[in-house]
Amino acid sequence: MRLLHVVTLVSDDGIFGGPPSVAVAQSAELAARGHDVTLMALWRGSGPAPDRIGSVRLRSRPARALLPGRGCIGLLHPLLVRDLWRAMGGADVVHVHAGRDLVSLAALAVAAVRRVPCVAQTHGMVEPRTALPVRLFDLLYLPLLRRARACCVLTGHERRLVARVLGPDGPPLRILPNGIRPGPPEPEPRRPRDPHVVFLARLHPRKRPEAFVEMARLVHQEMPEARFTLYGPDDGSLPAVRRLIDEGPAGVVRYGGALDPAEAHEAYRSAAVHVLASVNEPFGMTVIEALAAGTPVVCTDTCGIADELARRGAALVTDGSPQGMAAAVRRLLGDPELCARMARAGRRVVEDVYSIGAVADRLEEIYRGGGRDERTGGGGTDHAAREADGRPGQEPATPSPAP
């Protein structure tokens, strides 16, 4: 098949979060299976856009802020619309990694006008919102999203939220977890790693980097040899993080800036523990990346895949408080055998549930119009589906156009 994937923004600092890495991983696996795949996006970086990301062909335009002050959702380039029109003329299926943003709106509109089969994937970015700018945007956006052949969601919880947004006239909602290609296993027996704990995410209030710094302070009180690093682009929380670091003991916590994918992989591989402090995380792609690198994970009980990981012994799940996360980190740093067991369990869960091969199998089925209709009902393994359904004020994976 000739496939066109569209994602809002690809950048060298990862500011748009998980959707670009998911789009690249899916595109690479589909291309390896013989499909003709192109990825189209805006580009923001210190240099010109690459022609390829790994094995994936990239067509891009420089990101321009058409709606100033709206972050990634207000980005577009006028010529990207022309590029979309031309590219869809030869596509069998268009896969839009869709948020409430101008690029997604343009891609869905062009697919509708050109009558190209379209699959949307919302990545936790389309949730019920009542703010006036969102309601105005949705007057254009939702009718286009309802025309998709299918809409892919991460978990049962996200399926219920998207169903509330789209209503009874929405497309079939298909659960599609994120996937990753596991790296080579570590030699046995697993060698203990230095007591280095990492945070890899945007520095955004929902990601709770300040809670990570507070957790680090508590761990350091009992384990003074431990060191902590936050990696990721600033999305509003860096000033508060720097202030907390400066107020704490010198040399214990540092901010390492944004990482490219290769640097992030090395950060996972060298860390003793990865901590995802986020609340109401729709999925938690960094968790899967850490597990694939053989790194034990601590996460909160509102992470979308927390129950699955806990059931398989692949993560320590906490209540999200700095005290709870600190206790979990101390437990891992003090027990090399537990770390080794969790590393093995993490690799198994990636291979069994979150492999990119299984995701591509599912995508091929969806592209061909098959698969089980999942418009309604429960399912999924997410704790958030039970505890947070309908909770007001939840944040999507990337900023939405709310004031």
Which residues does each PLM region occupy?
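Short hydrophobic beta-strand element within catalytic cores of glycosyltransferases
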Residues: 296-300
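Aromatic "clamp/platform" in nucleotide-sugar-dependent glycosyltransferases that forms part
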Residues: 279
